[in-house]
């Protein structure tokens, strides 16, 4: 059914072909509905009038009321002049300044007339001024209708073509007045609206663009944010419910001799309570008859690999094979080494398949895999190639999930008669509200404690001028037999940046530490060169590894005890935490040194303080989300389960995310097949919102 909101934006009074082109190209606004959902990013209270004597240069946008006393002109060049209007409210004087548009100014603003002036006060030559302010003639205003003024994001192109926030505001107000009452269809159930004390969808649209008070803004935002989050959650849970019905999983009902022998003889230490809890959750999944789709979160060193191995042993005890995919060859080798060390002489065959495995060795692995003679295959993307066939793949473990595309994981499905159980591991802590939105279709397990005896990493902030003590500390650590990472933000010198670069830094460090062996690793090296340099460090052949952030994920060198991050202000919290996680893997005390200049923004200082204050990855992830925002909700578009969030903010709307989740769960619990007529309003609206039918969520 065609709605008034489907009308082309060109047919809105005040738009026309030229503005239509700008709106569509710059803001992706094509219809009335698109404009209605282009929400303001902030509001200013226009009911408050300040006296000129009250102004200060640290004020945000304010307004004053008064009369123009006189105009003055100051030449800036042969063809340009600055126009200044001296403006008074009877008690003080402020200057209104324009650097262009003199003809328009003299035509529209008159000496002696009363105006309301709106802008940001600044000080110039000892006097307050408003540069290019908004001015309204008091005689033209309905003062009783002045309320909250919305502000809309615009692009540089729009500003150059005269379409700033005020122009968008005029269009939205025209739109709101043109839409007949009752023309906007409700998208939530009346019972839900009443129970949650929400305003109607129509009221919310009107008030979000044309509020009379702060209460109008808040009630409109709550309604529209909740609606957005509710449909994201409803879609996620609908997919998950459909997946549980459609895709049967292998039932791993027994714990057999391999698992029991490993647990009794080979387990290197007692499991933490968190590991035990996660194993129970995984066991419940594997014997449920449904395919497991579980995200396993755990900070660096929390014991995720051991949990993954025990999970794979359960599959082997039940007559199945297992695989583990890692994003790089060196990580695959580390997993292979770790798993073999755990298993010792147990009758479990573990092999590795990467792009480097070629010739007869590769043929042998592929043959034995298809025959069922290999129990666990560790590898990289090579595992998902068409030539790789398992006899019966029961579980796939994917390490560091963000390095694999969804389509790549989908190829795992072709490796077995039924879809294998999926366990996705990540050492990147994901805040609860974000996980609920991006990975909401996965069950989430968290290992939130480290094995006993592990010493917390000491994080210290140092300034650029403290490098002598820094280098002395590094020298002492290396002499005691430890290894050190030194991370640079850049590979080579940049004309536009005074940041330290790796190439120059490596040469200087070789001069500072002539008695030690250094490796260097960066993203422009050939993969084989990078792997070789990394392997030297892993094997202890070099003591100092000079690198960019390519060492951010997964590398395990227990002997490395110092992480130095230069120009640490250039890195986000999550990245700093991941880099820090390269150390602290052995029994010795480890250190992370964040080196910066003295001039730091308040946000950078917050990041540094948080890093020095805590090693808790989940606290850091929550803080990072609040400081940085969720960006584009990494993965939501390719996952096919979430929609663009136009007003909700995952970082700041955590309570609404949880509320939306709870309400969506109630609907799914009552109508898992999405067929009850009492919910047809919801299912029809969800169908309109969905932009893909690919069930990526079933693959995680």
Report the location of each language-model feature.
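Long, highly charged, low-complexity intrinsically disordered interaction regions
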Residues: 1-13, 25, 232, 242
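OB-fold nucleic-acid-binding modules
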Residues: 38-65
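Upstream accessory/linker segments immediately N-terminal to the RecA-like ATPase cores of bacterial MutS
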Residues: 74-266, 670
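Flexible hinge/switch segments at interdomain interfaces of large molecular machines
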Residues: 249-257, 448-451, 586, 634-639
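Inter-lobe coupling/hinge segments of SF2-like helicase ATPases
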Residues: 277-280, 291-610, 673
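Accessory helical-bundle/CTD segments and flexible terminal tails appended to RecA-like ATPase motors
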Residues: 515, 534-544, 551-558, 563-566, ...
């Amino acid at each position: 059914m065609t709605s008034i909101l489907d009308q082309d934006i060109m047919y809105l009074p005040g738009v026309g072909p030229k503005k239509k082109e700008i709106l569509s190209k710059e803001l992706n606004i094509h219809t009335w509905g698109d404009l209605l959902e282009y929400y303001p990013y902030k509001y200013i209270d226009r009911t408050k009038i300040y006296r000129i004597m009250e102004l200060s240069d640290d004020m945000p946008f304010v307004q004053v009321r008064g009369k123009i006393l006189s105009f003055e002109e100051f030449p800036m060049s042969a063809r340009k002049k600055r126009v200044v209007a001296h403006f008074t409210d009877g008690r003080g004087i402020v200057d209104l300044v324009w650097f262009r548009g003199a003809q328009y100014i003299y035509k529209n603003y008159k000496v002696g007339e009363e105006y309301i002036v709106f802008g940001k006060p600044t000080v110039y030559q000892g006097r307050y001024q408003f540069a290019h302010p908004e001015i309204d003639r008091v005689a033209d205003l309905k003062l009783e209708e002045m309320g909250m003024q919305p502000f809309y994001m615009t692009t540089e192109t729009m500003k150059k073509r005269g379409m700033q926030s005020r122009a968008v505001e005029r269009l939205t107000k025209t739109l709101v007045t043109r839409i007949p009452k009752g023309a906007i269809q409700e998208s939530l159930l009346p019972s839900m609206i009443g129970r949650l004390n929400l305003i109607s969808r129509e009221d919310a649209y009107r008030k979000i663009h044309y509020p009379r008070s702060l209460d109008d803004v808040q009630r409109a935002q709550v309604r529209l944010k909740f609606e957005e989050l509710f449909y994201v959650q409803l879609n996620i849970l609908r997919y998950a419910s459909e997946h549980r019905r459609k895709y049967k999983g292998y039932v791993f009902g027994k714990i057999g001799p391999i698992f029991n022998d490993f647990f009794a003889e080979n387990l290197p230490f007692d499991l933490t309570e968190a590991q035990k809890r996660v194993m129970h959750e995984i066991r419940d999944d594997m014997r449920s008859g449904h395919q497991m789709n579980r995200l396993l979160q755990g900070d660096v060193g929390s014991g995720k690999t051991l949990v993954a191995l025990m999970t794979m042993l359960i599959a082997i005890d039940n007559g199945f094979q297992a695989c583990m995919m890692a994003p790089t060859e060196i990580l695959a080798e580390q997993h292979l080494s770790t798993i073999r060390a755990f298993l010792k002489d147990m009758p479990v065959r573990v092999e590795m398949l990467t792009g480097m495995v070629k010739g007869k060795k590769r043929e042998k692995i592929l043959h034995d895999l298809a025959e069922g003679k290999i129990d666990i295959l560790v590898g990289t993307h090579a595992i998902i190639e068409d030539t790789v066939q398992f006899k019966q793949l029961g579980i796939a473990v994917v390490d560091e999930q963000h390095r694999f595309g969804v389509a790549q994981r989908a190829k795992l499905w072709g490796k077995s008669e039924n879809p294998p159980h999926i366990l996705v591991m990540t050492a990147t802590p994901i805040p609860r509200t974000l996980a609920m939105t991006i990975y909401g279709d996965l069950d989430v397990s968290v290992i939130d404690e480290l094995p006993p005896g592990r010493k917390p990493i000491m994080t210290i902030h140092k300034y650029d001028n403290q490098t002598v003590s820094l280098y002395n500390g590094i020298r002492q650590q290396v002499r005691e037999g430890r290894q050190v990472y030194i991370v640079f933000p850049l590979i080579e010198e940049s004309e536009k940046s005074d940041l330290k670069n790796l190439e120059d830094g490596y040469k200087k460090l070789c001069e500072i530490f002539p008695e030690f062996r250094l490796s260097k690793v960066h993203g422009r090296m050939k993969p084989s060169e990078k792997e070789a340099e990394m392997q030297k460090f892993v094997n202890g052949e070099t003591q100092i590894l000079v690198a960019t952030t390519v060492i951010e994920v997964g590398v395990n060198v227990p002997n490395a005890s110092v992480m130095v991050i230069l120009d640490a202000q250039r890195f986000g919290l999550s990245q700093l935490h991941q880099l820090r996680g390269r150390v602290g893997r052995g029994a010795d005390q480890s250190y992370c040194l964040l080196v910066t200049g003295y001039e730091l923004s308040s946000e950078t200082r917050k990041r540094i303080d948080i890093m020095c204050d805590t090693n808790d990855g989940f606290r850091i992830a929550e803080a990072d989300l609040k400081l940085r925002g969720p960006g584009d909700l990494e993965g939501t578009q390719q996952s096919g389960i979430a929609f663009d969030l136009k007003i909700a903010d995952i970082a700041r709307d955590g309570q609404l995310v949880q509320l939306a989740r709870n309400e969506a769960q109630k609907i799914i619990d009552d109508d898992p097949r999405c067929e009850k007529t009492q919910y047809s309003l919801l299912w029809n609206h969800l169908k309109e919102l969905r932009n893909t039918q690919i069930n990526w969520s079933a693959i995680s």
